[in-house]
Structures are given as structure tokens and as C-alpha cells.
Amino acid sequence: MELETHLSKYFTLAFTHKSMSLEMREKLAINSNATLKEFLQTIKNHCPNIKECMVLSTCNRFEIYASLKHGANTNEQKNALLKILAQNKKMSVSDLEKCVLMNTDESAVHHVFSVCSSLDSLVVGETQITGQMKNAYKFAFEEKFCSKDLTRLLHFAFKCAAKVRNLTGISKQGVSISSVAVKEALNIFEKERIKDKKALVIGLGEMAQLVIKHLLNKQFEALILGRNAAKFEDFIKELEEPKKVSFQNIENLNAYINEYELLFCATSSPHFIVQNRMLKETIFRRFWFDLAVPRNIEKPVLDNIFLYSVDDLEPMVRENVENRQESRMRAYEIVGLATMEFYQWIQSLEVEPVIKDLRELARISAQKELQKALKKRYVPKEYENNIEKILHNAFNTFLHNPTIALKKNAQKEESDVLVGAIKNLFNLDKSNANHAQNLNLYKCEYYEE
């Protein structure tokens, strides 16, 4: 739906597990801040009609969120971004075109709110996505690729996600890919009658930490292979049973890779961590879970190794989705309402309506006082038109500097607070002003985590 307004035009491009294979998502994935900054800078350099931009890259999706300059053609922006992606990732534009989902304006806002609320996730209700979006926004904001427009959008998205979690039961069951993987591992453990409840975990990022917590919850012991011993020491302080977890440097991978029946791998490496040249024959069967995108485990050549990728877990997720249909429906109602409220709030913060309302308030006040003066015969009736002109010129002169200042600050980060304060001071649309006043946008929720 195209809005007939000068409000910011929101725009999203999405490649997800629903539309794109794991192999293609691997090519799109960005796993380092340096690469992400370079990609965002390329967009900034080659897409002058994109005002602000951020990228969300996870194991299940690659998405670009942007605000466009007024009058920008959305199809032209899509084509430009697909061309940049194709060149950057050595893919064809036609392949990307087949998989991309574009949203603009209200549908873009609804999409961002749905993603943040985990309604578009492989595991509906998983809470990891909100944190990933906060990190993506934080990076783009701090590197100055986004400002007021996306801050407004993401701040409201975080509020919407919190409301969905609080008002529905959508996050009460299995809540992440990691929990589904551990649940499947437990089923394998019981079916295979494995003696020792032990697992090898490669990585110590957010996904790996979730795996470890789920393993401990199921009474497993875990050996972690990573690069940062200090990070491990900080992590185990969060655990109820830290003695069930041990750490070795990942350089010792060869010494452990053939010793465990259960293995979970989740690192940000763009290359295979576990390679076939490391493998030896074992008398026991092995079950490996590769939760990384790009994948960290080379497809095993040994017959007794069973490898599960992120996409392989999808059938195990379907039951999770079916169990949450009622919660999903309620959640989508909340997202729909939040989308409407977002645009109402944005419109309440626009500078032009405030300037118009201020001038109208001045005109009404002047006219009211003039009529009082005429009624009490302080001035003759025949002078009414001349006095109206004098008053009109007077309040125009009075409001000239504030008008210039408001227009000058319209695109600055503090404009929302400024407009909210003016509306509150002059009682202009008081309900909306109070709402704006309660939202301190530049202390965004990501600072709380």
C-alpha cells in the first residue's frame, strides 16, 4: 500500500529458509563485522536513494532493511541491491530474483515486526532472533548507516516483540534451533542406548552457548572447543552446574573429533572446521549437528556418521509450529495493531503538521482576543480588518525563527523529542504528544541486554 505522504518510505528485501536453500544462504551469510561494514558501505556508495540501511544475517535469513528518499522507485532500489549482492557474493541476479521477497511501506513495517516477534522463524517463538536484530541494528547505528528512520522502526519492533512474548504463549515451548537439536540428540541417545551422556561442542558463540545450556538441562556433560578461554570462564559463571563443562583450545580438535558420539558445531567461521581428513573409523555410530551457516562440517565420507544441518531439523520443527497456531494468530493480531500504531505515532511526530498547528493556534488566539476587544469597544469596528493584518504579521514574525529551527532539525536524531515537547507545551494533540514523550528513542532497548 503506497502512502500519500512525505513520511519515510520503508523497504525490505528478504531471503529466508522458506524461499532459499541452505547452499544459497551460505553464500549470502555475513559473519564478520568488517565484511558487514564493507557491504553496507557499498550500498551507501552505489544507492543514493537509500537514506538508511541495515543487514540482518542469521542461519535462516539474510535481510536488508532500508528507508528510501521521497520519490525513490522501489523496483529500481531492489534491482540495484540485487546487482550489488550478485557481484559481492558471486551469484547470479536471476537466482536471487527467484528467492527474494520485497516489501514496502506498511507491508515492510509489518514484515520487520513479524520477524522480530519470531513469527517468521523456522522455530516459531524462538527468542534468539530479537537479540540478533538488536545486534544488527546496534552495529548499523554505531557505524552511522542508520539514524532516525530505522531507529524509530526497530525501537517499535522491539516493543512489539516484547508485547507478543508477554501476551501470548508463543515462547513457552522449544524456543530455538539449538533446543530442537538437543531434543533430537536426546531421542538418538535413548534410541541408540548410548552409555555416556557426553557431547562435544565446537564454538562458544550465542548458538553454542544455548546448545550447552540445553545439554546441561538434559543432564549431559560437554567438552567445549573454542579459541577464547577467558570467554569460557565468563560463560560458566552463568551455569548452575559448571563442573559438567570443560574447555580445550580448538587447536586440539584432532584429539577429540573421533572420541564422541554426539557433536554440535556452531561457529562463525566461513570455512569447514571439521574436515574429512580428520576422521578415523570408530566402532560406534556418530551423530553430528551442524548449526552454522555457512556450514562448519564437511559432508562425512564415513558411513557411520549421520549429519544434521539446520534445514534437516525443519521436519522436527513442524510439530512445534502446529502446537502454536492459536498463539500465532493472537501474535499476528498484535503485530497488525502495532503496525497501525506505528504509523499513527510517526505521523504525530512530523514537523509540518506541528508548524501548521502552531500557526492555527496563534490565529485562533489572536482572533479570540480581537473579538473580545471589539465586543468591549476597545477598538472601532471599522478597524477590524487592519488589526487582523497587524496580528497576522505579528504572530508570523513571532513564529518565524521557531519554524526555521523546526524545519532545520527535522532530520536530526533529536527531532522526535523536540516535536513531542512542543506538542506537549502547546497542548497540540495531547494524547500523541504524551505517547511520543514516553518513548526515548535514542536509549533503545538493545542497551538493556
From Swiss-Prot:
Single GO MF annotation: NADP binding
InterPro entries assigned: 4pyrrol_synth_GluRdtase, 4pyrrol_synth_GluRdtase_dimer, 4pyrrol_synth_GluRdtase_N, GluRdtase_CS, GluRdtase_dimer_dom_sf, GluRdtase_N_sf, NAD(P)-bd_dom_sf, Shikm_DH/Glu-tRNA_Rdtase
Source organism phylogeny: Bacteria, Pseudomonadati, Campylobacterota, Epsilonproteobacteria, Campylobacterales
PANTHER family in alphabetical order: GLUTAMYL-TRNA REDUCTASE 1, CHLOROPLASTIC (PTHR43120:SF1)
Keyword Oxidoreductase appears in the UniProt entry: yes
Stored PROSITE patterns: GLUTR
Residues engaged in binding NADP(+): 203-208
Similarity comment: family membership: Belongs to the glutamyl-tRNA reductase family.
Role description: Catalyzes the NADPH-dependent reduction of glutamyl-tRNA(Glu) to glutamate 1-semialdehyde (GSA).
Entry text on domains: Possesses an unusual extended V-shaped dimeric structure with each monomer consisting of three distinct domains arranged along a curved 'spinal' alpha-helix. The N-terminal catalytic domain specifically recognizes the glutamate moiety of the substrate. The second domain is the NADPH-binding domain, and the third C-terminal domain is responsible for dimerization.
Catalysis: reaction(s): (S)-4-amino-5-oxopentanoate + tRNA(Glu) + NADP(+) = L-glutamyl-tRNA(Glu) + NADPH + H(+)
Site (Important for activity): 111
Organism: Helicobacter pylori (strain ATCC 700392 / 26695) (Campylobacter pylori)
E.C. number: 1.2.1.70
Protein's GO biological process: protoporphyrinogen IX biosynthetic process
Gene from which the chain derives: hemA
Pfam families, A to Z: GlutR_dimer, GlutR_N, Shikimate_DH
Binding of substrate, residues: 58-61, 121, 126-128, 132
Subunit structure: Homodimer.
Active-site residues, Swiss-Prot/TrEMBL: 59
Keyword set, alphabetical order: NADP, Oxidoreductase, Porphyrin biosynthesis
Entry protein name: Glutamyl-tRNA reductase
Enzyme class: oxidoreductase
Miscellaneous field: During catalysis, the active site Cys acts as a nucleophile attacking the alpha-carbonyl group of tRNA-bound glutamate with the formation of a thioester intermediate between enzyme and glutamate, and the concomitant release of tRNA(Glu). The thioester intermediate is finally reduced by direct hydride transfer from NADPH, to form the product GSA.
Pathway: Porphyrin-containing compound metabolism; protoporphyrin-IX biosynthesis; 5-aminolevulinate from L-glutamyl-tRNA(Glu): step 1/2
